[in-house]
């Protein structure tokens, strides 16, 4: 075979690569050779600065290789290559539109390489690349620069947050949006901010201020980008975390493969690398998680922002946004109003013209109206809208889907402001539970169930239900007035702990009566957590600090055990109420109070309320809660929540909505009751059946699927499976030999089998 002739350019390229390798190994010895190449680079640079568009392909190739060489060894000769970064910046800034594509990408890559070698800092790199990102007409160059900017910011914030760099870039993005509000260049600011927020590199309020300016821009695309950031940025974060968790390495599988496969250095390194990655993931999981607030919570001055957004993009008649984009802005405004409980009264009158069944995307308008409602919105402002929905949507002439959507929208509004409608309108709407359509019936029943919980007085007696009627009579249900907030008066769940302690006392008393006299003379020590075996040291100062401890006299201790026990058990049942306003001779006991309760009904209710308040706060004011008490209190709270969730569907639904109020409402939530009466088509049933099931190209048996799963995990078949699939003629010899064995040989084989099984098989896995 004849020897191939090597072209001159290939020789130069090979020489430069070889020179780079030698310089990396011994910089001092090859300083002169590098200086010669530096002079060649400088000459080519001057040619490119004079006329970059007219350069030949050979010159471009040569300059490309020289830039690559200098960039890789610039950190070894800092004195010679000091002007090199400025040369690249100047070349890229002035001639990025006329440079060759490959050379342009090499210059960008060389700047990034210099940043990684700490020849230049991140601020210098990003301030060079960002103007080119905005102004370059080349899509490939913009994509490359965007990728480099994101990766550099990620690396700069990898070990610790680089606040100085972040502030600089955020200021650049903010100025880009505010300098020209009509330009579409601000779209890059939205993309960069959204990506860094999604990756949790920027988590403070400054990126939210940048996106606020994007929402107030005059360019439609920039406004849409800003609105989508606030409406969907947190969901993107969660999806990214789920994707990262799916990529976790299976340690069990890696260990299994390392035991089965042949031991090589490559596999050992791969195993160690996977092990290190798993340890890093574990450290990340157990590390203290920083507070991760939603972007909507970090907005400065949400009231002013919501008002500006509404006036500029919704109330302004000159605005030419499409309906879809206006709905995005509306969703953001209503989310802000509902989340921060803002007062934007013109917003509610703006809704009136859109609340008709013929309006396009009317369910989205209904969902936004419900989002914008909260308990501090005046009922006089909301009531006309509810009446409009009832008149337009809920009538005998309306279609079932329309009526169901209207009733559900009214229910969502009433859930946030129960005073939004009159009793007459509520009675008319509740009567729709007799409708033949299932969706309308369920929507009306949902409205009735809601008012049974929050405002049963507005319902007729026959619609209130048993629990609401009993709660009204007992005074347990107290509807809140407009502007009134339900404040906590005691420790959450303290009554559960008090009830638990009373039950424990009663159990001890019953056990004491069954066993006869107590060995300790009838004295019962209350196990309040300090006397438990779990706590070795108890504090005596807490007992002597207050004046709440009952000390029994000697005469009581000397008395019979049964009398004291009867006395104690009687004292534990119900404490007598004493009217302290009377003199000692006119003390009124609980029994006398009960006798006179019929003559004074109002006084009885007041005294009962006072007694209830004293009873609830008794444990918190007279007892120091121990760690055991607090642990039990937490357990009782969880059990009470579980009972409530399993018991009452309406309460559960209300609590879920209050819990996820930040998620906002969608058109699907409003349309949900209308779907109840519909029969699913065959295609919908098949699609529902295929959900959460692996896609199968062909039908396979369970064993085949199990085998495929096993092979995917890198596991081989068992010895039992191998023996079963073995050729019959290959097993004949062993079978014949088994039959000819003597008893001694059989005994040896059995003993060897037992010994191997105890040792963990032939591989001795048990040792």
UniProtKB/Swiss-Prot annotation:
One BP term from GO: ribosomal large subunit export from nucleus
Official protein name in the record: Protein SDA1
Compartment list: Nucleus, Nucleolus
Positions with biased composition (Basic residues): 749-767
Coiled coil: none
Organism of derivation: Chaetomium thermophilum (strain DSM 1495 / CBS 144.50 / IMI 039719)
SUPFAM superfamilies (alphabetical): ARM repeat
UniProt region (Disordered), positions on chain: 504-614, 662-767
Ranges annotated as biased composition (Basic and acidic residues): 504-521, 680-701, 710-721
Organism phylogeny: Eukaryota, Fungi, Dikarya, Ascomycota, Pezizomycotina
PANTHER family to which the protein is assigned, alphabetical: HSDA/SDA1-RELATED (PTHR12730), PROTEIN SDA1 HOMOLOG (PTHR12730:SF0)
